[in-house]
Amino acid sequence: MADDHPQDQAEHERIFKCFDANGDGKISASELGDALKTLGSVTPDEVKHMMAEIDTDGDGFISFQEFTNFARANRGLVKDVAKIF
């Protein structure tokens, strides 16, 4: 998207790679759960809810595009996450 700064794109890529533990180019529910545990305690229901919100095509994985779309819509949250990762 035209309003993304190159540094935002680089930050999204960096965070995505941290979440994508096995490096397959997509974030599974398990990987999301593990990453969210780093941020604090998280329940399986919270992970399911987050997956449902971010995984817009419903394939069970978060693609980089889906992650970027979520990051654009939640800039403040992503900035906070970037400080931790």
Curated annotation (Swiss-Prot):
Q: Keywords for this entry?
A: Allergen, Calcium, Metal-binding, Repeat
Pfam families on file = EF-hand_7
Please give the Gene Ontology molecular function terms for this protein: calcium ion binding
Q: What is this protein called?
A: Polcalcin Aln g 4
Provenance organism: Alnus glutinosa (European alder)
Q: Where is the EF-hand domain?
A: 7-42, 45-77
Q: Where does Ca(2+) 1 bind?
A: D20, N22, D24, K26, E31
Please give the InterPro entries that the UniProt record associates with this protein: EF-hand-dom_pair, EF_Hand_1_Ca_BS, EF_hand_dom, EF_hand_pair_protein_CML-like
Q: Which SMART domains match?
A: EFh (SM00054)
Binding-site residues, Ca(2+) 2: D55, D57, D59, E66
The lineage's top-level taxon is: Eukaryota
